[in-house]
């Protein structure tokens, strides 16, 4: 429960999307324990502020389907392997959260009894209300859908206030800022602008889903100091995507 000395929250329930690649840290593969522990501490701070936190993790640090696809492995098989990679990341994060005495539940779109709970919308909402972190794993459970789309879907289902996409850059740019020094960083974008400009925020399925349901997105640099705390208290960090420019 938030006490009177804590700042007023703009977002009470969030869905945080964290890429698998971000979990690698400076490595080329796997999970950097220091990144995992840092993420767990950031989440703990939000929970202690009274924020309800759901998460979706990517799996790109453990599995990339492109190489296997080029070798002849089918797309559906590759996508299923990617879903399992997200489960491995979810298990690692749950362990990191529990090491700092923060209760966490994993809910998987693919049943894996005895390891994680199956996804159940009403139970997920109950866990969130009880102060537990809920990690949604295995994407949507269907091939051809990205973890970005899964994040937006789960956010809508649980009634989150916003989807927060943590990246390695400080927002959305008109072009790759590493390749184009004239690239412009946007503070605000509409869903339509993202789609018409072909900006790499999320895949078009995820953007259209958010547009249809009025779910705002915020893209930010996870390495920015106190980024999550600043966002949930209403500070403009990174790029906000919504129906208009005054979300």
Curated annotation (Swiss-Prot):
Give the family this protein belongs to, as stated in its UniProt record: Belongs to the UMP kinase family.
EC no. given is: 2.7.4.22
| Annotated ATP binding sites | 17-20, 60, 64, 167, 173, 176
PANTHER family recorded for this chain? URIDYLATE KINASE (PTHR42833), URIDYLATE KINASE PUMPKIN, CHLOROPLASTIC (PTHR42833:SF4)
Can you quote a single GO CC term? cytosol
> Can you name this protein?
Uridylate kinase
Pathway field: Pyrimidine metabolism; CTP biosynthesis via de novo pathway; UDP from UMP (UMPK route): step 1/1
Question: Where, by residue number, does UMP bind?
Answer: 59, 79, 140-147
Q: Where in the cell is it found?
A: Cytoplasm
What GO molecular function terms would the record report? Answer: ATP binding; UMP kinase activity
Keyword Zinc present in the record's keywords: the answer is: no
Q: What does this protein do?
A: Catalyzes the reversible phosphorylation of UMP to UDP.
Give the encoding gene's name: pyrH
| Organism from which the protein derives | Legionella pneumophila (strain Paris)
Please provide the record's keywords in A-Z order. ATP-binding, Cytoplasm, Kinase, Nucleotide-binding, Pyrimidine biosynthesis, Transferase
Biological process terms from the Gene Ontology for this record are: 'de novo' CTP biosynthetic process; UDP biosynthetic process
Q: Subunit structure, briefly?
A: Homohexamer.
Activation and inhibition: Inhibited by UTP.
What does UniProt give as the signal peptide span? Answer: none
Catalysed reaction, written as an equation: UMP + ATP = UDP + ADP
Coiled-coil spans are none
Q: EC class of this enzyme?
A: transferase
